[in-house]
């Protein structure tokens, strides 16, 4: 049994993005996040991003992506963006 417990937190933007989704996908993402908290190492599920986004990790939930920053010193996974895979990486103007 693991002694480490990860905490998940959402930025205001990610929280708004989550609330804007249809209820079934919102619930699926919430379940995924609860499962992430139980892992010894959240990197076992996600994939590192590259280039200018290399400080972030992505998690796939169906056609949606969670973009996160993993803070090992705080055992925190900070969700910074949630969106459809076709839109989530686009820069807002």
Regions found by a protein language model. Give the residues of each.
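Surface-exposed, Lys/Arg-rich phosphate-binding patches that contact polyanionic backbones
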Residues: 13-24
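Residue-level recognition of oxygen-bearing side chains
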Residues: 13, 54, 87
């Amino acid at each position: 049994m693991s002694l480490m417990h990860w905490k998940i937190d959402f930025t205001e933007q990610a929280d708004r993005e989550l609330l804007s989704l249809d209820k079934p996908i919102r619930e699926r993402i919430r379940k995924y996040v609860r499962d992430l908290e139980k892992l010894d190492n959240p990197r076992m599920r996600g994939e590192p991003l590259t280039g200018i986004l290399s400080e972030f990790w992505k998690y796939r939930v169906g056609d949606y992506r969670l973009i996160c920053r993993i803070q090992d010193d705080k055992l925190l996974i900070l969700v910074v963006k949630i969106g459809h895979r076709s839109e989530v990486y686009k820069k807002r103007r």
